[in-house]
Protein backbone atom coordinates (compact mmCIF):
# COMPACT_ATOMS: atom_id res chain seq x y z
CA UNK A 1 0.00 0.00 0.00
CA UNK A 2 2.80 2.40 0.93
CA UNK A 3 4.70 1.50 -2.24
CA UNK A 4 1.58 1.88 -4.40
CA UNK A 5 0.96 5.39 -3.05
CA UNK A 6 4.60 6.35 -3.54
CA UNK A 7 4.63 5.00 -7.10
CA UNK A 8 1.45 6.88 -8.02
CA UNK A 9 2.01 10.19 -6.25
CA UNK A 10 -0.84 9.61 -3.82
CA UNK A 11 -0.98 10.44 -0.14
CA UNK A 12 -1.56 7.53 2.20
CA UNK A 13 -4.03 8.67 4.88
CA UNK A 14 -5.01 6.38 7.74
CA UNK A 15 -8.28 6.86 9.57
CA UNK A 16 -7.45 6.58 13.27
CA UNK A 17 -10.73 8.08 14.47
CA UNK A 18 -11.60 4.82 16.24
CA UNK A 19 -8.15 3.28 16.53
CA UNK A 20 -6.26 6.31 17.78
CA UNK A 21 -5.46 7.66 21.23
CA UNK A 22 -4.43 4.31 22.69
CA UNK A 23 -7.41 2.15 21.73
CA UNK A 24 -5.15 -0.53 20.21
CA UNK A 25 -2.38 -0.26 22.79
CA UNK A 26 -0.37 2.12 20.60
CA UNK A 27 -0.99 5.82 20.19
CA UNK A 28 -2.37 5.16 16.71
CA UNK A 29 -3.85 1.97 15.29
CA UNK A 30 -1.60 1.84 12.25
CA UNK A 31 1.60 1.53 14.31
CA UNK A 32 1.49 -2.25 14.68
CA UNK A 33 1.43 -2.61 10.87
CA UNK A 34 4.81 -0.97 10.32
CA UNK A 35 3.34 1.08 7.44
CA UNK A 36 4.07 4.81 7.64
CA UNK A 37 1.21 7.05 6.46
CA UNK A 38 1.48 10.57 5.11
CA UNK A 39 -1.36 11.70 7.35
CA UNK A 40 -3.72 10.38 9.99
CA UNK A 41 -7.15 11.49 11.14
CA UNK A 42 -8.22 11.54 14.78
CA UNK A 43 -11.42 12.19 16.72
CA UNK A 44 -13.53 10.40 19.35
CA UNK A 45 -10.96 9.65 22.08
CA UNK A 46 -8.94 12.75 21.24
CA UNK A 47 -11.38 15.10 22.97
CA UNK A 48 -12.18 12.88 25.94
CA UNK A 49 -15.90 13.08 25.19
CA UNK A 50 -15.90 16.58 23.74
CA UNK A 51 -16.30 17.08 19.98
CA UNK A 52 -12.86 17.35 18.46
CA UNK A 53 -11.18 16.08 15.34
CA UNK A 54 -7.73 16.48 13.88
CA UNK A 55 -5.61 15.62 10.90
CA UNK A 56 -1.90 15.12 11.45
CA UNK A 57 0.36 15.29 8.42
CA UNK A 58 3.75 13.61 8.64
CA UNK A 59 7.01 14.05 6.75
CA UNK A 60 6.81 15.90 3.41
CA UNK A 61 3.00 15.94 3.60
CA UNK A 62 3.26 18.28 6.57
CA UNK A 63 4.52 20.97 4.17
CA UNK A 64 1.40 20.86 1.97
CA UNK A 65 -0.64 23.19 4.22
CA UNK A 66 0.54 26.63 5.22
CA UNK A 67 -1.07 28.96 7.74
CA UNK A 68 -4.31 30.28 6.26
CA UNK A 69 -4.68 27.54 3.62
CA UNK A 70 -7.50 25.87 5.49
CA UNK A 71 -10.12 27.08 7.92
CA UNK A 72 -12.92 25.67 9.98
CA UNK A 73 -15.99 27.29 11.48
CA UNK A 74 -15.61 25.27 14.66
CA UNK A 75 -11.86 24.63 14.55
CA UNK A 76 -9.63 25.36 17.50
CA UNK A 77 -12.28 25.24 20.21
CA UNK A 78 -10.28 26.10 23.35
CA UNK A 79 -12.31 23.89 25.69
CA UNK A 80 -12.08 20.84 23.41
CA UNK A 81 -8.37 21.36 22.78
CA UNK A 82 -7.75 21.73 26.54
CA UNK A 83 -9.57 18.42 26.96
CA UNK A 84 -7.31 16.84 24.33
CA UNK A 85 -4.22 18.03 26.20
CA UNK A 86 -5.64 16.49 29.38
CA UNK A 87 -6.32 13.21 27.54
CA UNK A 88 -2.77 13.07 26.18
CA UNK A 89 -1.34 13.87 29.61
CA UNK A 90 -3.47 11.17 31.29
CA UNK A 91 -2.48 8.55 28.72
CA UNK A 92 1.18 9.28 29.40
CA UNK A 93 1.07 9.74 33.19
CA UNK A 94 -1.23 6.79 33.87
CA UNK A 95 0.66 4.51 31.45
CA UNK A 96 -2.59 3.76 29.63
CA UNK A 97 -0.89 2.23 26.57
CA UNK A 98 0.76 -0.51 28.65
CA UNK A 99 -2.49 -1.05 30.56
CA UNK A 100 -4.48 -1.39 27.32
CA UNK A 101 -1.96 -3.96 26.06
CA UNK A 102 -2.15 -5.96 29.31
CA UNK A 103 -5.94 -6.00 29.63
CA UNK A 104 -6.38 -6.52 25.89
CA UNK A 105 -4.11 -9.58 25.91
CA UNK A 106 -6.02 -10.96 28.89
CA UNK A 107 -9.36 -10.52 27.09
CA UNK A 108 -8.07 -11.97 23.81
CA UNK A 109 -6.73 -15.04 25.61
CA UNK A 110 -9.63 -15.66 27.99
CA UNK A 111 -12.45 -15.01 25.52
CA UNK A 112 -10.91 -17.51 23.09
CA UNK A 113 -11.35 -20.23 25.73
CA UNK A 114 -15.13 -19.81 25.96
CA UNK A 115 -17.12 -22.59 24.26
CA UNK A 116 -19.08 -21.20 21.32
CA UNK A 117 -16.44 -18.59 20.42
CA UNK A 118 -14.64 -19.66 17.24
CA UNK A 119 -12.41 -16.61 16.68
CA UNK A 120 -11.11 -13.70 18.73
CA UNK A 121 -9.21 -10.93 16.96
CA UNK A 122 -8.13 -7.40 17.61
CA UNK A 123 -5.53 -5.22 19.20
CA UNK A 124 -5.56 -3.64 22.62
CA UNK A 125 -9.12 -2.88 23.65
CA UNK A 126 -10.71 -3.10 20.21
CA UNK A 127 -11.76 -6.72 19.99
CA UNK A 128 -14.00 -8.73 17.68
CA UNK A 129 -15.39 -12.17 18.38
CA UNK A 130 -16.96 -14.64 15.98
CA UNK A 131 -19.54 -16.94 17.49
CA UNK A 132 -20.24 -20.48 16.35
CA UNK A 133 -23.99 -19.84 16.11
CA UNK A 134 -25.94 -16.76 14.91
CA UNK A 135 -26.89 -15.69 18.45
CA UNK A 136 -24.99 -12.41 18.79
CA UNK A 137 -28.08 -10.25 19.33
CA UNK A 138 -29.31 -12.62 22.04
CA UNK A 139 -25.89 -12.54 23.71
CA UNK A 140 -25.98 -8.73 23.72
CA UNK A 141 -29.37 -8.79 25.44
CA UNK A 142 -28.29 -11.41 27.99
CA UNK A 143 -25.04 -9.55 28.75
CA UNK A 144 -27.04 -6.38 29.33
CA UNK A 145 -29.28 -8.25 31.79
CA UNK A 146 -26.13 -9.46 33.57
CA UNK A 147 -24.54 -5.99 33.68
CA UNK A 148 -22.32 -5.68 30.60
CA UNK A 149 -22.83 -3.55 27.48
CA UNK A 150 -21.53 -4.95 24.20
CA UNK A 151 -22.32 -4.55 20.50
CA UNK A 152 -23.33 -7.07 17.84
CA UNK A 153 -22.65 -5.72 14.34
CA UNK A 154 -23.59 -9.09 12.83
CA UNK A 155 -25.43 -12.32 13.60
CA UNK A 156 -22.24 -14.09 14.68
CA UNK A 157 -20.09 -11.06 15.50
CA UNK A 158 -19.51 -9.32 18.82
CA UNK A 159 -17.56 -6.05 19.06
CA UNK A 160 -15.87 -4.96 22.27
CA UNK A 161 -14.45 -1.49 22.88
CA UNK A 162 -14.40 -0.96 26.65
CA UNK A 163 -13.10 2.15 28.36
CA UNK A 164 -9.31 2.30 28.21
CA UNK A 165 -9.15 2.47 32.00
CA UNK A 166 -11.13 -0.75 32.53
CA UNK A 167 -9.56 -2.54 35.49
CA UNK A 168 -8.31 -6.11 35.31
CA UNK A 169 -10.99 -7.01 37.86
CA UNK A 170 -13.68 -5.54 35.59
CA UNK A 171 -12.23 -7.43 32.62
CA UNK A 172 -12.31 -10.67 34.61
CA UNK A 173 -15.93 -9.99 35.59
CA UNK A 174 -16.80 -9.33 31.95
CA UNK A 175 -15.28 -12.63 30.81
CA UNK A 176 -17.43 -14.44 33.39
CA UNK A 177 -20.56 -12.53 32.31
CA UNK A 178 -19.90 -13.14 28.63
CA UNK A 179 -19.25 -16.84 29.17
CA UNK A 180 -22.45 -17.20 31.20
CA UNK A 181 -24.50 -15.25 28.65
CA UNK A 182 -23.23 -17.29 25.71
CA UNK A 183 -23.80 -20.55 27.56
CA UNK A 184 -27.37 -19.59 28.48
CA UNK A 185 -28.21 -18.41 24.96
CA UNK A 186 -26.71 -21.50 23.33
CA UNK A 187 -28.76 -23.80 25.56
CA UNK A 188 -32.11 -22.09 24.85
Regions found by a protein language model. Give the residues of each.
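Conserved N-terminal phosphate-binding loop of PLP-dependent enzymes in the Aspartate aminotransferase
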Residues: 1-188
Amino acid sequence: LRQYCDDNGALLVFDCVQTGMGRTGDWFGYEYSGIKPDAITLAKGLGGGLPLGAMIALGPASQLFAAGDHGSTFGGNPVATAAALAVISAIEKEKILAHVDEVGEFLLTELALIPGVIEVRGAGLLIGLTLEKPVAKLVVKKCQELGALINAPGDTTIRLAPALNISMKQAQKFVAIFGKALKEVNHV
